[in-house]
Amino acid sequence: MLQLTTYRNLQVFLVIMTAIGMSFALFFLQRYMGFSPCPLCIFQRIGLMIMGGFALIAALFHPKSMVIRLLLWLGSLAGIGWAAIVAGRHVWLQHLPADQVPSCGPGLDYWLDTLPMQQVLKEVFAGSGECASIDWTFLGLSIPEQSLILFSILILTHLLILWRIVRPATPKPLAR
């Protein structure tokens, strides 16, 4: 019987979720709906891609060494953890009273061209008016709220992967 929670299957699940999330953002939200991603959205996507990259490496090479598995897990967790933190900040900005919403800034491209990276991060996390606007909802949830739910599920998946790294699945003896 196929066991769905093996190390490799869980890594493949993360890769598939990355592909679905990125496809949804690019093809539906950007191309079909016409939304341009705000700086916080871009940073969430970067975190999701980092997670997906580490998960892809883990799924393709299926390392036997616990140390390598843990390093890949940490890289993947760092990516999705980053995305979840950014999504949490984004949700917080969207729930600020209108008079406390930061004004719109010059944009991420300008910041990247003119400011050092540390200052860019500070500006992005300070947020802007475009990050606080709610352009679309589904089931009463804004895009960052939906993203935060997805990222939370992926973090829980990482806990299951850690369990598989520490306590690998043992094959069951065949019944006679």
Swiss-Prot record:
* A single GO molecular function term of this UniProt record: protein-disulfide reductase activity
Which residue ranges are assigned to the Cytoplasmic compartment in the record's topology? Answer: 1-11, 64-70, 165-176
Q: Pfam family example for this protein? A: DsbB
Q: Which domain of life is it from?
A: Bacteria
Q: How does it sit in the membrane?
A: Multi-pass membrane protein
**Location relative to the cell:** Cell inner membrane
Which UniProt keywords are listed? Answer: Cell inner membrane, Cell membrane, Chaperone, Disulfide bond, Electron transport, Membrane, Oxidoreductase, Redox-active center, Transmembrane, Transmembrane helix, Transport
GO cellular component terms attached to this protein's record: plasma membrane
Disulfide feature: 38-41, 104-131
Give the matching Gene3D superfamilies.
DsbB-like
One GO biological-process annotation of the entry reads: protein folding
Q: Provide Periplasmic-side residue ranges.
A: 29-46, 89-145
According to the record, the segments passing through the membrane are 12-28, 47-63, 71-88, 146-164
Provide the family line. Answer: Belongs to the DsbB family.
Query: What is this protein's function?
Result: Required for disulfide bond formation in some periplasmic proteins. Acts by oxidizing the DsbA protein.
Supply the name of the protein. Disulfide bond formation protein B
Q: Which organism is it from?
A: Psychrobacter cryohalolentis (strain ATCC BAA-1226 / DSM 17306 / VKM B-2378 / K5)
